[in-house]
Regions:
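Glycine-rich, proline-tolerant flexible connector loops at the mouths of alpha/beta enzymes
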Residues: 27, 34-54
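N-terminal amphipathic alpha-helix/helix-capping segment at the start of soluble metabolic enzymes
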Residues: 1-17, 130-140
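Active-site-adjacent beta->alpha loops and helix N-cap segments on the catalytic face
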Residues: 3, 45-59, 74-78, 96-111, ...
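Catalytic cores of alpha/beta
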Residues: 76-88, 99-100, 154-159
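Single conserved hydrophobic/aromatic residue that forms the stacking wall/gate
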Residues: 160-170
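Conserved, mostly hydrophobic/aromatic
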Residues: 18, 42, 90, 104, ...
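Short, well-ordered coil/turn segments that N-cap beta-strands
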Residues: 11-16, 36-37, 63-67, 87-88, ...
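Active-site glycine- and acidic-residue-rich loops that bind
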Residues: 94, 144-158
Length: 170
């Protein structure tokens, strides 16, 4: 399975999503089977911890809805467990500089393009990848969304924008 959310974005299609900040697998399952293209799992402003996030991502399996998680900051420590759980996109808050934008990309990508460690234990099931090489390549399909929320980000916008098909600015 590729990333249907990414495919629709790349085609310029409108993608309908829904946000949840409640740590509920039942809610994640209901929402992901309600016709949405993506499920916004909010770990920054909600009560969702990594265990709940993993279970919520698992609850989206079997649907065409891509789980996309807003992490607390653009770091490997917050991003790696979310991706290892099977997230198909990551929303990074407070991207204010070229450095924070680069840190976000590095947290998603495997070496040599990034700094993400290899942990192919759960996510390949969500991505339906049985081959390790195929799963490694699937990191290129992860949608990276940078939130522009601060005046410093506006002032640095030309530096923040990295021309890469998996990046989006909001």
């Amino acid at each position: 399975m590729s990333n249907p959310f990414r495919e629709r974005l790349d085609k310029g299609q409108v993608c309908a999503g829904v946000l949840t900040s409640m740590p509920s697998t039942n809610m994640a399952q209901m929402l992901s089977n309600s016709g949405f293209d993506w499920l916004f799992i909010d770990m920054e402003h909600g009560a969702i911890d990594i265990a709940s996030c993993y279970n919520m991502i698992t609850a989206t399996s079997g649907s065409a809805c891509s789980p996309v998680v807003r992490v607390m900051e653009p770091s490997i420590a917050f991003t790696k467990p979310v991706l290892d759980s099977g997230a198909m996109g990551v929303i990074f808050p407070m991207i204010t500089s070229k450095e924070t934008a680069e840190a976000a990309v590095a947290a998603v990508k495997y070496p040599p393009a990034g700094k993400r460690g290899w942990g192919p234990f759960y996510a390949p099931m969500r991505w339906q990848k049985k081959d390790s090489i195929e799963y490694y390549k699937s990191s290129d399909d992860i949608v990276i969304i940078s939130l522009i929320e601060h005046i410093d980000a506006i002032n640095n916008l030309s530096l923040i924008h990295i021309s890469e098909p998996t990046r989006r600015l909001v």
